[in-house]
């Protein structure tokens, strides 16, 4: 495991401030929004569809504290772009949007450094105000939208969105999800694409390496991974980039690549200040999580006896809830992962609480992999790895 202190070149102008929202392309946006509201504790935020004058695409935006997810579906049978995307990838993340300052300059610089700009800056407005956007290509079919507010925006979400058509009376009766903001978003790559992708973020967006780990440190009996975390200059946006490493059997990273039809967003980590209450509530709402064996906690108790930090939370409760713990000399983190949130074994979510710890759970990767491998085996996908021809994503050639 390596942490980096060199932030690299400081952007002369413009800023990436934070994650603005995550856009999902799904088969049925209405039902997807209901699922995330029901299981994760989101609430309807805004709507765009036939009733608001959007004739091609319907959008349901949901929010929990500072987290905004947008679910989009095609309204018409002739939408080839969204139709082909659904056939190839299934439901999943299409776009990770960043709130920025000086969108024009950031796009100009990204373009000069080789980024594929899919849509040059444009402005939309309504009674709430003006917003500037631009779209750049990242790994696979995933994109980044830059969002810049041109003055205070007083609307519900973004121009064109209106009040949700319906608010489920059941939602206020359910326990809070206790989820606060997006901690990090992980992208899975085919073998040998991790470095080109992380280099792209450093070159085109002036991100820098924050953390990395290799397959000598992260492996099970069967499989392994490598990971590089890139972040913006202010370190408010963290994007781990994973790739599979050769092992005896197919890794869960390779399983994702196979079922997603290439690279894409593997998981979204949501930060909480009270993971115990969050997981008690989310389990009560019917959310499914990966499990950890009891011997994980037996080993953890032994390691904590000589640790320089003290975990404040009750270990018995953490064990009952199957929450994982990782720590160093300065602090610790608590984390747990959902099972895939669609039929394809692709996207899942993470709930994380940080206590003066800025890593990504390297000490838990082995336990996480073994838990996923158990489910992977049940799916018939923990198979002997065979060499495959894999092409580099267009954005990085």
Curated annotation (Swiss-Prot):
Its main location: cytoplasm. The keyword Aminoacyl-tRNA synthetase does not apply. Pfam families: Glyoxalase (PF00903). Signal peptide: none annotated. Pathway: Amino-acid degradation; L-phenylalanine degradation; acetoacetate and fumarate from L-phenylalanine: step 3/6. Its cofactor is Fe cation. Keywords: Cytoplasm, Dioxygenase, Endoplasmic reticulum, Golgi apparatus, Iron, Membrane, Metal-binding, Oxidoreductase, Phenylalanine catabolism, Repeat, Tyrosine catabolism. InterPro entries: 4OHPhenylPyrv_dOase, 4OHPhenylPyrv_dOase_C, 4OHPhenylPyrv_dOase_N, Glyas_Bleomycin-R_OHBP_Dase, Glyas_Fos-R_dOase_dom, Glyoxalase_1_CS, VOC. SUPFAM superfamilies: Glyoxalase/Bleomycin resistance protein/Dihydroxybiphenyl dioxygenase. GO terms for biological process: L-phenylalanine catabolic process; tyrosine catabolic process. It is a peripheral membrane protein. It comes from the Eukaryota. Belongs to the 4HPPD family. NCBIfam families: 4HPPD. Catalyzes the conversion of 4-hydroxyphenylpyruvic acid to homogentisic acid, one of the steps in tyrosine catabolism. This is 4-hydroxyphenylpyruvate dioxygenase. The gene is hpd.
């Amino acid at each position: 495991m390596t942490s980096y202190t060199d932030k690299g070149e400081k952007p002369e102008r413009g800023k990436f401030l934070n994650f603005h929202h995550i856009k999902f392309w799904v088969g049925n946006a209405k039902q997807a929004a209901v699922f995330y509201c029901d299981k994760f504790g989101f609430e309807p935020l805004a709507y765009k569809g036939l009733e608001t004058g959007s004739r091609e695409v319907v959008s349901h935006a949901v929010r929990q504290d500072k987290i905004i997810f947008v679910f989009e579906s095609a309204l018409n049978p002739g939408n080839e772009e969204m139709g082909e995307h659904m056939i190839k990838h299934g439901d999943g993340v299409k776009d990770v949007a960043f709130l920025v300052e000086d969108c024009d300059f950031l796009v100009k610089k990204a373009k000069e450094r080789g980024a594929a700009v899919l849509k040059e800056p444009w402005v939309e407005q309504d009674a709430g105000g003006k917003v500037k956007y631009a779209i750049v290509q990242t790994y696979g079919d995933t994109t980044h939208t830059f969002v810049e507010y041109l003055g205070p925006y007083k609307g519900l979400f973004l121009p064109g969105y209106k009040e949700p058509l319906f608010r489920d009376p059941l939602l206020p009766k359910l326990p809070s999800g206790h989820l606060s903001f997006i901690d990090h978003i992980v992208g899975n790559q085919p073998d040998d694409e991790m470095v080109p992708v992380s280099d792209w973020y450093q070159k085109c967006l002036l991100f820098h390496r924050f953390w990395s780990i290799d397959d000598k440190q992260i492996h099970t009996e069967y499989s392994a991974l490598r990971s590089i975390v890139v972040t913006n200059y202010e370190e408010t946006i963290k994007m781990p980039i994973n790739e599979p490493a050769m092992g005896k059997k197919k890794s869960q990273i390779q399983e994702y690549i196979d079922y997603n039809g290439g690279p894409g967003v593997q998981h979204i980590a949501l930060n909480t200040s009270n993971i115990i209450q969050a997981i008690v509530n989310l389990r009560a709402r019917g959310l499914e999580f990966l499990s950890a064996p009891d011997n994980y906690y037996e080993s953890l108790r032994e390691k904590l006896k000589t640790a320089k930090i003290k975990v404040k939370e009750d270990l018995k409760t953490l064990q009952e809830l199957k929450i994982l713990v990782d720590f160093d000399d300065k602090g610790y983190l608590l984390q747990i992962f959902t099972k895939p949130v669609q039929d394809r074994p692709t996207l899942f979510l993470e709930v994380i609480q940080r206590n003066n710890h800025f890593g990504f759970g390297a000490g838990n990767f082995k336990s996480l992999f073994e838990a996923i491998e158990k489910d992977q085996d049940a799916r018939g996908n923990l198979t002997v790895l065979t060499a495959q021809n894999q092409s580099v994503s267009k954005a990085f050639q």
